[in-house]
Regions:
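Residue-level signal for mature regions of secreted extracellular proteins and peptides
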Residues: 146-147
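Intrinsically disordered, low-complexity linker and terminal tail regions
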Residues: 141, 300-305
Length: 432
């Protein structure tokens, strides 16, 4: 099979094509299965199997049964994670922390009904902010709207009380604020489940105790950039938009990013993984559906504006594609956004009216080549496999070699990556 035939199969799954343009042999069906496996699209791929079966393009029975069994497992797993996200959000909010589910389960509602529970899920990523920070931002927003100087929020405005170990019989509490409150809260959760192991902490998240075997990453920063200037802009932008995301509740019992924030956040997520271990088509499919939902909000917003109204979530203005691109360019991702548009067009046959910018064919071909070689998060990339799976030094050299491939395309982010990695090692030693 040619590469385009695999893409046509995915286009059938997402509803952009009725059938395939080539005859599919039994061997080809097995190739399609392996392709979906590499890209973590088994569940979505089975939807294409069902649609093709309805038009007379039949998958071998044994493979179809195997495929269906895996799709059912994915559906049950999604139901479980949705329930766990709801429970986690309720517990954290009871304890004084606002939450917003990112990535995996945060993307499910963007998918159409027939695909929603067939998205292959992994762990739970939750963006967490103490209530005090949210209230402070609202104060500042009200001040800005009234043309006053920003109201400053002191620690007296609130905090999160964390039980600490003192060696005494009575429990003592210390009040923490901001990022420190999130970190100490998660550490307390580890103590409550009897874990003496220090949780792994990184610049943007800390690993919380598992929920019935499901890994949980608690983000005090939703994402980051290697360049100090771009990272400063990114952190400021997401801080300004945190409150509306925390309040964007769904019928599932947890909040997700608003459509406008998500179309920015998901691009940052893609860019980060492009520099890290690699990207897969599952992440690109997430962005495909995020774009469609955002575009529908923009169209609805235009209708409301004609009536003198605008809204998203709780009254937050919907970002136009020009505004989205202005934000992404300020993060150094303008060229990458064009590459993503190219991949979405080639793989999913996305309509041009969903574009946030013109496709960049040159960078898009590079991105698509990386995706096809590496599979989901680069797990199937055989280039320099010995270095990748070696010790700390070998892995560091592998990562440097990978980043150097991107220097010509994204020089600022690529050249800052080794510097950030060294700095981050020191940061983890100080904060771990």
């Amino acid at each position: 099979m040619e590469e385009k035939d695999y893409f046509e199969f995915l286009q059938v799954a997402v509803g952009n094509r009725k059938s395939l343009s080539v005859r599919v042999s039994d061997a080809d069906w097995h190739r399609l299965f392996e392709f979906c496996k590499r890209q973590a699209l088994i569940g979505v791929g089975f939807t294409a199997v069902e649609k093709l079966h309805a038009v007379g393009v039949v998958c071998p029975a044994a493979l179809r049964m195997q495929w269906m069994a895996l799709a059912l497992q994915i559906e049950r797993r999604n139901d479980l994670l949705n329930e766990q996200c709801s429970q986690l959000a309720g517990r954290y909010e009871h304890d004084g922390l606002s939450t917003c589910i990112l990535k995996g389960q945060g993307n499910c509602l963007n998918y159409p009904e027939e695909l929603r529970n067939r998205r292959q899920c992994g762990d739970i990523d939750v963006w967490t902010v103490p209530f005090e920070n949210e209230e402070c931002r609202l104060k500042k927003q009200r001040s800005a709207a009234e043309g006053k100087a920003n109201e400053e929020c002191s620690e007296a405005d609130g905090g999160v009380a964390i039980a600490v170990q003192t060696g005494k019989e009575d429990v003592e509490y210390v009040e923490y604020h901001g990022r420190k409150a999130v970190i100490e809260y998660v550490r307390m959760q580890h103590r409550l489940v009897g874990s003496n192991v220090s949780p792994i902490i990184r610049y943007h998240h800390i690993e919380a105790p598992k929920i019935d075997g499901t890994e949980v990453e608690v983000h005090f920063r939703p994402c980051y950039a290697h360049s100090p200037l771009k990272n400063w802009r990114m952190q400021r932008w997401f801080k300004d938009h945190a409150d509306v995301c925390m309040k964007n509740k769904t019928h599932m019992g947890f909040a997700v990013p608003t459509a406008s924030v998500n179309v920015v956040y998901q691009m940052c997520h893609l860019f980060s993984h492009y520099f890290d271990e690699g990207l897969g088509l599952r992440q690109l499919m997430d962005y495909y559906f995020a774009l469609r939902v955002w575009h529908n909000d923009v169209m609805e917003c235009k209708d409301l504006q004609s009536q003198g109204m605008w809204s998203e979530g709780l009254g937050t203005q919907v970002l136009s594609k020009e505004e989205v691109m202005a934000v992404l360019r300020s993060f150094g991702m303008g060229k990458f956004a064009g590459a993503v548009m190219y991949v979405l067009h080639e793989v999913f046959a996305i309509s041009s009216h969903y574009y946030i910018c013109a496709p960049n064919e040159k960078e898009g071909k590079k991105l698509l080549e990386e995706i096809m070689k590496g599979g989901n998060f680069g797990q199937y990339d055989t280039r320099d496999a010995g270095m990748k799976r070696g010790g700390m030094i070998k892995h560091g050299l592998w990562k440097l070699k990978r980043v150097l491939r991107l220097v010509r395309s994204y020089p600022e982010e690529a050249l800052w990556e080794p510097v950030f990695r060294v700095w981050h090692l020191g940061w983890r030693l100080m904060n771990g």
